[in-house]
């Protein structure tokens, strides 16, 4: 019945979608049924991601509308039917995506929770699909042990499992590894420190604290450490979670009078990996509990890795004793990727998606998308989708078409005028000084920095840049750029100034 229901939905999608969209994304899908589960196979990772993002919601609606209350659970996988075993979906955007399906007439649940099992089990009723996710060695559940007193909560939702989902809730993304992390000058130290911790836990840096802006690879490195630890020792208790999850678990434990179980769980792990620690700010009770957990782990020789969007001393609302302890190990910054690294990231992502990306096209995108890796990946996905829809190869012309709104915004945000104003404010001089003939170091050096930034962040030629800096010759601009590049290697102050200005102008 499930396969026939799928075919019915496909025919409805054929009527709803433009022919090109249907033929590109829906027609290649293969399906097979096993019990009440419908397995849908995509030919590659890119198709899986696109279907998951753009069409999954409508597919579920159609299954519900035409399933007479017996809509099957759905799994998205890469590969083909049983003739070819499915393979893992690298970088699948959802490990276990949940789509809300409210059921107004659902009867209240009364069955007791089943005995714990290593992996989640699914129970399907005619009115709703209920997901029972029993506690594993890597997930804290204060309800465990109290099932006989607490009525189970009905989950009025369907869980759609995309291939790559973990069998337990350690929340590690297994597609984030050291092998597919693109290394460059901006993240070289952070990558080396993470590898040291992964390869020599308890003998490396403890805690390891990674900080930097969004989308720069901190979370990737943290997952890579966790995955490597499990590869070396599959029985290791490695727990990754967002700081808000830690807070939520603690609140739940307090509500259920299970705080001792909470403490035992988090203090018994071999490695605790917490993302975005800045969300502990101004949460005094959470900070108190984490302080004692942190101390217990370090005293026991267990590894702790933390990330934040800023240097720990700069996190307002965080207790000084925590800031001090975060400095016991190694604190490393992850910087925005430089041009060469951005190009390498684009080429690697295109290769993973099995898409041919010319080097000049990658260079064109990398020159204009500078802030973080996440924006780079988003831009590349748009270009690839545009290429698929239009049936054209990826060229600079196609990139201009597919990213025209983004490129227009970038050009508007980063102008030479904006650079001059920002540099003048940073060095506390006047814009007129930058344009003047003054050659004192206090003016000449900021002028050179502004010229170098103008060359890196805009599409203006050297003569054009020289013209807006008081009518200077293009050779003066070229000399300024070379000088600043040299000083960034030898002068820590210039390197820090340039990095700060670059961050201000591109975020």
UniProtKB/Swiss-Prot annotation:
Region span, Domain IV, binds dsDNA: 388-507
Quaternary context: Oligomerizes as a right-handed, spiral filament on DNA at oriC.
Comp. bias (Low complexity): 85-110
Organism expressing this protein natively: Pseudomonas fluorescens (strain Pf0-1)
Keywords noted in UniProt: ATP-binding, Cytoplasm, DNA replication, DNA-binding, Lipid-binding, Nucleotide-binding
Region ranges (Domain I, interacts with DnaA modulators): 1-87
Family the entry assigns: Belongs to the DnaA family.
Name of the protein: Chromosomal replication initiator protein DnaA
Gene3D superfamilies: 1.10.1750.10, 1.10.8.60, 3.30.300.180, P-loop containing nucleotide triphosphate hydrolases
Residues holding ATP: 215, 217-219
Localization: Cytoplasm
Disordered: region residues: 85-158
Free-text function comment from the UniProt entry: Plays an essential role in the initiation and regulation of chromosomal replication. ATP-DnaA binds to the origin of replication (oriC) to initiate formation of the DNA replication initiation complex once per cell cycle. Binds the DnaA box (a 9 base pair repeat at the origin) and separates the double-stranded (ds)DNA. Forms a right-handed helical filament on oriC DNA; dsDNA binds to the exterior of the filament while single-stranded (ss)DNA is stabiized in the filament's interior.
Pfam families: Bac_DnaA, Bac_DnaA_C, DnaA_N
Gene Ontology BP annotations: DNA replication initiation; regulation of DNA replication
Keyword DNA damage in record: no
Residue span of region Domain II: 87-170
Biased composition (Basic and acidic residues): 126-140
SUPFAM superfamilies linked to this entry: P-loop containing nucleoside triphosphate hydrolases, TrpR-like
């Amino acid at each position: 019945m499930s396969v026939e229901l799928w075919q019915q939905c496909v025919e409805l999608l054929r009527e709803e979608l433009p022919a090109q969209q249907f033929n590109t994304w829906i027609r290649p899908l293969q399906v097979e049924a096993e019990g009440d589960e419908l397995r849908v196979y995509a030919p590659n990772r890119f198709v899986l991601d696109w279907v998951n993002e753009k069409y999954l919601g409508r597919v579920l609606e159609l299954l519900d509308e035409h399933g007479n209350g017996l809509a099957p659970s759905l799994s998205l996988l890469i590969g083909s039917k049983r003739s070819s075993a499915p393979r893992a979906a690298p970088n699948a955007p959802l490990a276990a995506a949940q789509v809300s399906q409210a059921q107004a007439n659902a009867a209240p649940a009364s069955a007791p929770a089943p005995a714990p099992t290593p992996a989640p089990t699914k129970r399907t009723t005619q009115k709703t699909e209920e997901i029972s996710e029993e506690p594993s060695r890597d997930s804290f559940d204060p309800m465990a042990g109290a099932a006989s007193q607490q009525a189970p909560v009905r989950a009025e939702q369907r869980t759609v499992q995309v291939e790559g989902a973990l069998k337990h809730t350690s929340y590690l993304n297994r597609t984030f590894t050291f092998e597919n992390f693109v290394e460059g000058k901006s993240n070289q130290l952070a990558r080396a420190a993470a590898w040291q911790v992964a390869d020599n836990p308890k003998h490396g840096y403890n805690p390891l604290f990674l900080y930097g802006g969004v989308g720069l690879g901190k979370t990737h490195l943290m997952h890579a450490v966790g995955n490597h630890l499990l590869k070396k020792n599959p029985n290791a208790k490695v727990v990754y979670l967002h700081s808000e999850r830690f807070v939520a678990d603690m609140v739940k434990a307090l509500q259920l009078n299970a705080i001792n179980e909470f403490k035992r769980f988090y203090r018994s792990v071999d490695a605790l990996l917490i993302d975005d620690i800045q969300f502990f700010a101004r949460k005094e009770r959470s900070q108190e509990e984490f302080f004692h957990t942190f101390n217990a782990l370090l005293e026991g020789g267990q590894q702790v890795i933390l990330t934040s969007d800023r240097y720990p001393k700069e996190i307002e609302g965080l207790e000084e004793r925590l800031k001090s302890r975060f400095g016991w190990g190694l604190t490393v910054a992850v910087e925005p990727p430089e041009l060469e690294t951005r190009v390498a990231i684009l080429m690697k992502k295109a290769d993973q998606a099995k898409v041919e990306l010319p080097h000049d096209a990658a260079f064109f995108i990398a020159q204009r998308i500078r802030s973080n890796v996440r924006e780079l990946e988003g831009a590349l996905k748009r270009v690839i989708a545009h290429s698929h829809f239009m049936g054209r190869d990826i060229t600079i012309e196609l990139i201009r078409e597919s990213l025209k709104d983004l490129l227009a915004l970038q050009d508007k945000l980063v102008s030479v005028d904006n650079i001059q104003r920002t540099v003048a404010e940073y060095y506390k001089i006047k814009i007129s000084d930058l344009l003047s003939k003054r050659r004192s170091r206090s003016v000449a050096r900021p002028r050179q920095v502004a010229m170098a930034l103008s060359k890196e962040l805009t599409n203006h030629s050297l003569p054009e840049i020289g013209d807006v800096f008081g009518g200077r010759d293009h050779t003066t601009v070229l000399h300024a750029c070379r000088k600043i590049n040299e000083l960034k290697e030898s002068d820590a102050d210039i390197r820090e100034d340039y990095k700060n200005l670059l961050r201000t102008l591109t975020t």
